[in-house]
Design a protein with these regions (language model features):
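Charged, terminal alpha-helix-loop-beta segments
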Residues: 1-176
Length: 176
């Protein structure tokens, strides 16, 4: 489903998800470098480069093409709640959303971190699920505030347009 500029949802959880995706898409449109810097700080391991890479004369096993343009595959599946009320069975069903991506991230997002015992329970089930996968799924649990903090680290004070978008998002988070 397309991310619209103005959300069309009535359920508060869906509004929060739509507004968060709009914030992230605005960051991407503003600066892909800053978007990928944000992603690297929040979800990707240090050795992962999600940016498009241009190479000349890259050798393969049987040839040397003139040039290649590549981007490592990744997928981030997001589950948003307005409390830490995540359901393990729902999160387990979300695992089937992944296919052959190199980096697979299940991002749980809420105003507060997931309760420790609940997170431990889900992550033990995830570990069993991952045993059969070549590229395991990683679970990242974070908050709206941490998401904003990471975006603010990726942009600087001169990014007035993006600062305004982030400020509006924070206003939404604290007042709606």
């Amino acid at each position: 489903m397309k991310i619209h500029y103005f959300q069309r949802y009535h359920a508060k959880e869906n509004v929060a998800t739509a507004n968060t995706m709009l914030l992230l898409s605005r960051l991407y449109q503003y600066s892909t470098d800053k978007f990928f810097r944000f992603l690297n700080s929040l979800v990707f391991p240090e050795n992962f480069e999600p940016e498009i890479v241009f190479r000349l004369q890259e050798k393969s096993s049987n040839s040397v093409p003139d040039a290649t343009i590549t981007q490592e595959s990744f997928k981030i599946v997001v589950e948003t709640k307005l409390s830490d009320w995540f359901y393990t069975d729902q999160l387990e069903r979300h695992l089937s959303s992944f296919e052959n991506e190199k980096q697979k991230i299940l991002l749980t997002l809420a105003p507060e971190y997931m309760e420790a015992e609940k997170q431990k329970n889900f992550e033990s089930k995830l570990a069993v699920y991952n045993e059969s996968l070549e590229n395991p799924i990683r679970h990242i649990n974070t908050t709206f505030e941490e998401l904003v903090n990471r975006i603010q680290e990726a942009i600087d004070d001169r990014d007035y347009e993006m600062q305004e978008v982030v400020e509006d998002y924070l206003n939404y988070c604290y007042h709606d």
